[in-house]
Design a protein with these regions (language model features):
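Conserved kinase catalytic-core segment
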Residues: 108-177
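Conserved ATP-binding subdomain of kinase catalytic cores across diverse folds
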Residues: 2-102, 129-133, 168-171
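A generic structural signal for residues located within well-ordered alpha-helices
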Residues: 50-54, 120-121, 235
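Aromatic-acidic/polar surface patches that form glycan- and anion
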Residues: 47-48, 115-119, 243
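C-terminal catalytic region of ATP-dependent kinase domains
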Residues: 158-273
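A short, terminal or domain-edge coil/loop segment
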Residues: 17-23, 90, 119-133, 192-205
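Short acidic (Asp/Glu) patches
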Residues: 75-83, 106-112, 147
């Protein structure tokens, strides 16, 4: 747990603010290098910071490659203007370490260069766990919503790319009174281009890992949410209950939901012959 935590302590200056994303992050220089900072005062509100932190922490918990990430206190010593014209507020925000690479352009060609191809299956799983519609989903009216720029390919060499999990700010953990969402069958994050890269063994491994998720594991993450992110005690309890219940549901159903059950069954029968 927390294998990818990053703990810079202060922001020295802003390097770039024209990043067109819903939370209007800014590229900053910290005492420990460059990072993308999402601040209080962002146009999406403080709850999105909590969702970002929890979603990234859950990906980290499952062993999925993420950016190094953390919570950093902004003291207001410098003024940080956001792209929408707002001003970053003092208090704790979410930060990820900058990496060399680029967002995905939707091509199969780039997916074939990914060295951690198993993380495609795992990313679909964590998106489905937290009900994150902001990478890929199909709305109820049948219209697909896709954001290629929410898939980052870290460049470790000229030929090899590493898929990195990020951006969970719109995850729908649970709404008050809608506990049934824990048993929702919708698959999130499964771009059509991803389907040929789904791996049966990765799906089985992550399903087995979800079986081990207990309330204490989720509570350890939820308890780290800063008070200024405005998630009260009742909502924290709802998130814990929902995430544990949904982990249990997906541990039994994820393989079927992404269409790999028949493949695994055929392989099992073959192995027994």
């Amino acid at each position: 747990m927390n294998k990818q935590r990053w703990n810079p302590t202060y922001i020295k200056r802003v390097l770039k603010k024209d990043i067109d994303s819903s939370m209007k992050p800014v590229l900053v220089r910290t005492d420990k290098g460059l990072g993308y900072f999402k601040a209080l005062g962002n146009p999406e509100g403080p709850h999105c910071l909590a969702r970002e932190f929890v979603g990234t922490s859950l990906a980290d918990l499952l062993g999925i490659s993420t950016f190094k990430y953390g919570i950093i206190h902004f003291d207001g010593a410098i003024e940080i203007q956001l792209l929408n014209g707002g001003i970053a507020q003092c208090g704790r925000g979410f930060i990820t370490q900058k990496e060399r690479g680029e967002v995905w352009n939707g091509s199969i060609k780039d997916l074939k260069r990914i060295t951690n191809v198993e993380d495609i299956t795992r990313l679909v799983c964590v998106d489905t766990w937290v009900r994150n519609p902001d990478r890929y989903c199909v709305w109820k009216n049948g219209i697909p919503h896709e954001r290629f720029d929410n898939v980052f390919l870290s460049r470790h060499s000229e030929t090899n790319l590493v898929l990195k999990s990020f951006d969970f700010s719109h995850a729908g953990f649970c709404e008050t009174g809608k506990a049934s969402q824990a048993y929702e069958e919708t698959v999130y994050g499964l771009f059509p281009q991803f389907k040929e890269f789904l791996r049966e063994e990765a799906a089985k491994q992550i399903s087995d890992k979800l079986k081990t998720i207990k309330s204490k594991h989720i509570r350890m993450i939820i308890d780290q949410i800063p008070s200024e992110w405005d998630i009260d005690a009742a909502m924290r309890d709802i998130w814990v209950e929902f995430l544990v219940a949904r982990a249990g549901f997906l541990s039994e159903n994820f393989i079927r939901m992404i269409g790999l059950q028949d493949t695994l069954r055929q392989r099992t029968l073959f192995d027994k012959e």
